[in-house]
């Protein structure tokens, strides 16, 4: 979906859009859309800059970082970004970025790619660690059992002789 900036004759334009199933590709095999994203946003012309603020609502399916089970995650990020024409970029100049500059995007011509913005905001809304639940116990590193659903199938404790000196030290310290 593109927004034609010629439609922005007034200084503001409000848009509501619900993507059709399969219309938006997240370009990431690890993230599957379960519900078509709904986007509501407002565009404002601020001189040469365009401000877009709004909200996205969708649900995605991802894999847990601990147990690798697929689970659904609601995603509802609010966003507030600025766009400027790419022509204002002067690559030969050295510029110190401010916090506001980190929320800047660039457009070419007279339209802005909203699909790219939606993809970016969905990815940014993901938590650093994707967990199916807070107390996920993960997989056994030896036998691979999902500890959320079954007990570990490997021996209770395998002795590794390389740790013998530390075990002796621990016993001596506990005995003191």
Predicted segments, located by residue:
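Structured interface patches
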Residues: 1-176
């Amino acid at each position: 979906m593109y927004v034609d900036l010629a439609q922005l004759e007034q200084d503001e334009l409000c848009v509501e859009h619900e993507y059709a199933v399969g219309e938006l590709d997240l370009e990431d095999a690890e993230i599957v859309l379960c519900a078509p994203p709904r986007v509501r946003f407002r565009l404002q012309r601020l001189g040469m800059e365009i401000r877009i603020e709004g909200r996205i609502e969708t649900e995605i399916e991802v894999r847990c970082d601990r147990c690798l089970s697929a689970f659904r995650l609601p995603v509802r990020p609010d966003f507030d970004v600025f766009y400027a024409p790419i022509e204002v970029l002067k690559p030969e100049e050295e510029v110190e970025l401010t916090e506001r500059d980190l929320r800047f995007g660039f457009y070419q011509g007279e339209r802005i790619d909203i699909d790219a913005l939606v993809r970016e905001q969905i990815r940014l809304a993901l938590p650093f660690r994707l967990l199916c639940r807070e107390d996920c116990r993960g997989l056994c590193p030896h036998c691979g059992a999902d500890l959320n659903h079954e007990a570990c199938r490997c021996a209770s404790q395998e002795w590794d002789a390389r740790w013998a000196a530390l075990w002796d030290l621990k016993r001596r310290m506990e005995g003191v």
